[in-house]
Each structure stands twice: as structure tokens, then as C-alpha cells.
Amino acid sequence: MNVNLEKKYKNTIVKELFKEQRFQSIMQVPVVKKIVVNMGAGDATQNSKVIEDITNELALITGLRPVVTKAKDSIASFKLREGMPIGAKVTLRGKKMYQFLDKLINIALPRVRDFRGLNKDAFDGRGNYTLGIKEQIIFPEIDYDKVKRVRGMDITIVTSATNDADARALLRKMGMPFKK
């Protein structure tokens, strides 16, 4: 696994983006600020053990202890009360962020069944990219035999880019496999 994604960014990607995107200063070149990995569990209202499973899996995948997310409002039709645990999330920054991004690009995404590339239109208009993964078993840390239920997750990559074009160029240079 290439752990030097951060070095690659600092040594080559910054210079290439500076020339291509016509920035006035090298400090305007976008950088990945943080990555937020979120797993929701709708069945956590009936079974409290589900949250424990999710937090363990997220901890294995990211290397950090997740924060349990709780419901903001009560919804009677979902048998949900305010304050009930309904998921978990991890915010990655620094070295762990670059390691996770490298693992996502080079190991996890190629293991997705029928993978034809990421949607290049999933940017939010402010330079952030969100992708959904249907199975947590694409990550090498997860043992398929120990998984009780296959769950998906949301991964949000927050960049300092002010528009989608700059963020797309940054992520493409980092190796994100976007659809053509």
C-alpha cells in the first residue's frame, strides 16, 4: 500500500494543479481537509447490539474510535425516540486521513462488484465529494465470516476548494477513479 499519498500531494500534485488551474498563489491550490465516514443503522432501534457492531467495524476500517450518532427528533412511524443511537461516524484528519484515502482508492474501490468508476457529479457545489458504499466488506480489515449483516456507509471528502472543478481536479490527481 502506498502510504506516501501525502508526499505525492506535496511534491507533485500541488505543482501540477498550480500550473493547470491558473492559481495566483500556491496557497490557493486545494487540499483535502478531512474525511467523514458515517454508518447508519435503522434496525438499531430494535436491537442495541447493532450499534456495538457498527462501532467495532468502523474502528477496524478507520483506525479511530467512532462517535455514536443519536436521533435529533422522535418519529413514531419508525419507533424512534429523540436521543436514541442510530449510527456512528468517524472524522479523519492528517496522516490517518491520507492513509484511509489511499486504502479507499487503491484497495477498497477496486473490490466493489461491477465497479465502473465513481459518479463525477456527486460534488455539493462547494468542493466537497460524497460517495456511498453499499458493502463494508470491501475493506480488507473486515472479516467476511464475522459480519452479521452487510451494511453500507457514506464517505464525505471535504476539500478547501471553492468550486467543484478544482475539487474534481484534485481528487483525480490523487487517483480517484471517476467515470469518463
UniProtKB/Swiss-Prot annotation:
Ribonucleoprotein found in the keyword field: yes
GO biological process annotation, one example: translation
Lineage: superkingdom: Bacteria
Gene Ontology molecular function: rRNA binding; structural constituent of ribosome; tRNA binding
Keywords (A to Z) from UniProt: Ribonucleoprotein, Ribosomal protein, RNA-binding, rRNA-binding, tRNA-binding
Cross-referenced Gene3D superfamilies: 3.30.1440.10
One GO CC term on file: ribonucleoprotein complex
Entry annotated with the keyword tRNA-binding: yes
NCBIfam families with a match to the protein in the record: PRK00010.1
PANTHER family named in the record: 60S RIBOSOMAL PROTEIN L11-RELATED
Subunit structure: Part of the 50S ribosomal subunit; part of the 5S rRNA/L5/L18/L25 subcomplex. Contacts the 5S rRNA and the P site tRNA. Forms a bridge to the 30S subunit in the 70S ribosome.
Function (record text): This is one of the proteins that bind and probably mediate the attachment of the 5S RNA into the large ribosomal subunit, where it forms part of the central protuberance. In the 70S ribosome it contacts protein S13 of the 30S subunit (bridge B1b), connecting the 2 subunits; this bridge is implicated in subunit movement. Contacts the P site tRNA; the 5S rRNA and some of its associated proteins might help stabilize positioning of ribosome-bound tRNAs.
Family of the protein in this entry: Belongs to the universal ribosomal protein uL5 family.
HAMAP family found in the cross-reference section: Ribosomal_uL5_B
Descriptive protein name: Large ribosomal subunit protein uL5
Organism annotation: Spiroplasma kunkelii
Source lineage: Bacteria, Bacillati, Mycoplasmatota, Mollicutes, Entomoplasmatales
Gene for this chain: rplE
